[in-house]
Amino acid sequence: MDEYSSIYSQPKTPRLKQEGFPDSIGDQHEKALIDENGEEDKKMASTEGTTGDSRSTPLTVSIPTFENVQALPTPMTYTPLSPGNLSMSPIDQSSLNIPKRRSHARLLDDMLSVTQPNQRVVSELIAPANLSPQRVVSLPTVTEEALVNDSVDSDNYTKEPYFPESSSSTEKCDDDIFQGFLLDHWDRPLLWKKVRPIGSGNFSTVLLYELMDQSNPKLKQVAVKRLKYPEELSNVEQINTSLRYKETLSRLENSLTRELQVLKSLNHPCIVKLLGINNPIFVTSKKPLCDLIIKTPRALPPCDMIMSYCPAGDLLAAVMARNGRLEAWLIQRIFTEVVLAVKYLHENSIIHRDLKLENILLKYSFDDINSFRDSPIYCKQNFIELADFGLCKKIENNEMCTARCGSEDYVSPEILMGVPYDGHLSDTWALGVILYSLFEDRLPFDPPPNASARQRSRATSHRIARFDWRWYRLSDYKTNVGKQIVENTLTRKNQRWSINEIYESPFVKTIADTLSFS
C-alpha cells in the first residue's frame, strides 16, 4: 500500500445531520470526492511510474457547491451579497458637511463686492434653487410657529392705515429713487437715491441710499434691506391649491413679522436701528403678506427695511484686511460692545441665534478707532452695531427652542444634535467662537494648522460635537483673561457661562465700566 492509499484508508469522520439541509447532500459530496480520488490515483500512479517522485503531485481539495439547496439561513447583518429583498438601514440625507464658506486668501475688494462668499449653513429649509449658495437666513420650523389658516380671506386680516401707490409693484422698487416712511410717520413719505449695493444673501439684498432733500443729517445715508422671496412663492395663483405654498408663505411671514417687531422694540447703541419701511402694512399688520396678496394678486410686493448704516463694513472683512493681526485692546473693546448688545437682548427675553463676525458691523474703521483712544469720544461713542435679526426669537422664561438654525461654524453642539436647546446658551457659545476667532485668526473648529488629510476630511460638525478645539497663538499665554471666557463658553451646556457671567468677567467688566453710552 503506497502513501496515498494509506491516506484514503483512514477511518472516515462520522457524518453529522445538519438542520435545514437535504439528507442527500452529504452522499453526493462523498460520491464526488471518491470519483475524484479514483481519477487522481490513476494519474499519480502514472506519474510515479515515469518520474519516481511521489511528491510532485499535490492533493486536490474538493469544495461542495450545494446545487440542491433551495434556501440559506437568513444573514444576521446586511452585506453586499445578501438577498436584494432585505431591508437596509435608511441613509441620512441631512449631512452637515457643507463646503467651506470662506478663504483666507480672499482679497478685500472681493469681500466688499456684491457677491458674498459661500457660507456653511445649518437650516431645516433648503435654499431656493435659483439663488446663489450663500448663507441661508433660514426660517424657523413649524414646531415653533403656527401656520396661517388654510384659506386666505380678506376678512381675517387687518387693514393697513395707509397704502402707498409707489410701492405697490416690484418694478417700481427697482428704480434708483426709493420712497419710504419713517416709523410712526406714515403721512410723510421720504425719497432716497440709490448709491450702490452693499451686500447680498439668499433672502435679502442690502443697498446704500442717500436722502434726496438732506433735511435730516441723521438720515443722510441709510442701508435698505430688500427681502427676496423664495421660489415657492413666485406663483401666487397656487395660493388656494398648494399646501407647500401656504406653509412657505406662513414661515416667511412669521419670520418677517417677528424680525420687524423685535427690531422696532429695540433701543440700544450697539444694535442696528430699524428707521422705517417702504410700506407701513409690514409693521402694522399681523399678516402683511396675506393682506398684500389680496391687493396685488399677481405678485408679492417688495419689502424694504430702512436701517442704520455702518460705513466701515462687517467685522470679518475688517479683520481679514488686517490679516488677523488685531491689538489686544481693540479685541477687548469690540468684544465688550458685542457682549453689551447680547446682554441687552437677553434681558429683554430675545435670543439672536445668528451671532457671528459677519453680523457685527463697524461704524468706524480700525484706524479711526485707534485715533479716538486719547480723546473723550473713545468712551462716549459706540463702535459696532449688531445686525441681522432674521433668526431672532422672543421667548418665555425657561422656554426651550427646537429650530435648527444658524451658521455651522458658530452653532452649539445641542443644535447640531437636534435636541431642544436653551437659546441664551447657544448665543454665549457663539460669543466664545467670536472671541476665539479674534484671538487666533481662525475659527475654533476649522482643521488645525498643518492638519493631515484625514483630519481635514472630518466635518466641522464632528469637531463641534466632540468639543475638539485648542489654543495655538495663545497656548503660551497662561494669564490671558480673555481665554477664560472662551474656555467657559466652548464647553458643555451645563457648564457654559451665561451672558451675565461673561459680562462680570474682568476682560469685559473693566472696559464696560468706563463706557458712558451703555
Swiss-Prot record:
Q: Give the EC number.
A: 2.7.11.1
Compositional bias (Polar residues): 1-12, 47-59
Catalysed reaction, written as an equation: L-seryl-[protein] + ATP = O-phospho-L-seryl-[protein] + ADP + H(+); L-threonyl-[protein] + ATP = O-phospho-L-threonyl-[protein] + ADP + H(+)
Positions carrying Phosphoserine: 132
Primary site of residence? cytoplasm
What InterPro entries has UniProt attached to this entry?
A: Kinase-like_dom_sf, Prot_kinase_dom, Protein_kinase_ATP_BS, Ser/Thr_kin_YKL116c_prd, Ser/Thr_kinase_AS
PROSITE patterns, sorted: PROTEIN_KINASE_ATP, PROTEIN_KINASE_DOM, PROTEIN_KINASE_ST
Gene3D superfamilies linked: Transferase(Phosphotransferase) domain 1
EC category name: transferase
Q: What SUPFAM superfamilies is this protein classified in?
A: Protein kinase-like (PK-like)
Question: What ranges does the record give for the region Disordered, renumbered to this chain?
Answer: 1-59
Please list the residue ranges that the record marks as compositionally biased, kind Basic and acidic residues: 16-45
Catalytic positions are: 354 (proton acceptor)
Q: Which keywords does this Swiss-Prot/TrEMBL entry list? A: Acetylation, ATP-binding, Cytoplasm, Kinase, Nucleotide-binding, Pheromone response, Phosphoprotein, Serine/threonine-protein kinase, Transferase
Q: Please, one GO biological process term? A: response to pheromone
Compartments annotated for it: namely: Cytoplasm
| Keyword Metal-binding found | no
Q: Which residues bind ATP?
A: 198-206, 225
Q: Which residues form the Protein kinase domain?
A: 192-508
Q: Which GO terms describe its molecular function?
A: ATP binding; protein kinase activity; protein serine kinase activity; protein serine/threonine kinase activity
N-acetylmethionine: which positions carry it?
Answer: 1
- Leftover remarks: Present with 1510 molecules/cell in log phase SD medium.
Q: What family is it from?
A: Belongs to the protein kinase superfamily. CAMK Ser/Thr protein kinase family. NIM1 subfamily.
Record's function text: Protein kinase that functions as a regulator in the pheromone-induced mating pathway downstream of mitogen-activated protein kinase (MAPK) FUS3. Diminishes transcriptional induction of genes in response to pheromone signaling.
Name recorded for this polypeptide:
Serine/threonine-protein kinase PRR1
